[in-house]
Amino acid sequence: MKDKVFVPPIKSQGIKTKLVPCIKRIVPKNFNGVWVEPFMGTGVVAFNVAPKDALLCDTNPHLISFYNALKNKDITGDLVKDFLYREGEKLLLSNGEYYYEVRERFNNYKEPLDFLFLNRSCFNGMIRFNSKGGFNVPFCKKPNRFAQAYITKISNQVDRISEIISKGNYTFLCQSFEKTIGMVNRDDVVYCDPPYIGRHVDYFNSWGERDERLLFETLSSLNATFITSTWHHNDYRENKYVRDLWSSFRILTKEHFYHVGASEKNRSPMVEALITNIAKDIIDHIEKSSGDILVIEE
């Protein structure tokens, strides 16, 4: 029986929903430190691991602002339901044009509820900003986007994640991955989900070879457990950095299908890699009968 994965209210391309069971299975059973994510994104991994203590960080201030609003009860499921019903009606009556009014309003005032509205009604769930920091993703062209069932689904997601946050000690910070990893202690577990190098990404900041090498060097010198995710290969090419940089660590893979962007080239099956410094004897105890993950390199 597969574990139920709780989906957060914020969507993004490349969300790690399908990797959550694999990640949960390799988290050390005796883990009692802080769960640290330098690239929290939607937060789907942290909210499903549901640790008692968590430090969740990102360079996208709008993600951090949204989850701090949930933590502080400034955003609740009921508030989201009322807001999306009201704004959804305006969207429908305008045949979708109201989306661009909300986008302009968000770019001026940065309200978390507007960010949620845009995130759930933009094209393909993309999170993309221009050089001036303005959200610039177009409308999904579905004026009836916020039907009652969809609003209920989102408000339930807000309530579920709010409950998880309220049961633990969660800190959300907007800062660089270097600063976040610098806060890690020996008993902590670090999960990194950086933008995938060499792939189409929609993050607040770009990611290149220098960033990948800096992350590798930072994690290599870390005196704590880490797990990081990246892409391994697809039908077109392989991620050379897995071989050239990360091959000294244990690497596990899982294949699944990603919907990324409008390009057919980016809609092929992709093999994900989980890279970790967790000891080999612990990895060897992972149940392999489901075929979810496979140790491919040591």
Curated annotation (Swiss-Prot):
Catalytic activity: a 2'-deoxyadenosine in DNA + S-adenosyl-L-methionine = an N(6)-methyl-2'-deoxyadenosine in DNA + S-adenosyl-L-homocysteine + H(+)
Group of enzyme by EC: transferase
Transmembrane spans: none
Record's keyword terms, sorted: DNA-binding, Methyltransferase, Plasmid, Restriction system, S-adenosyl-L-methionine, Transferase
Presence of keyword Acetylation: no
Family under the similarity heading: Belongs to the N(4)/N(6)-methyltransferase family.
NCBIfam families registered for this protein in UniProt: dam (TIGR00571)
Record's protein name: Type II methyltransferase M.EcoRV
Organism in which the protein naturally occurs: Escherichia coli
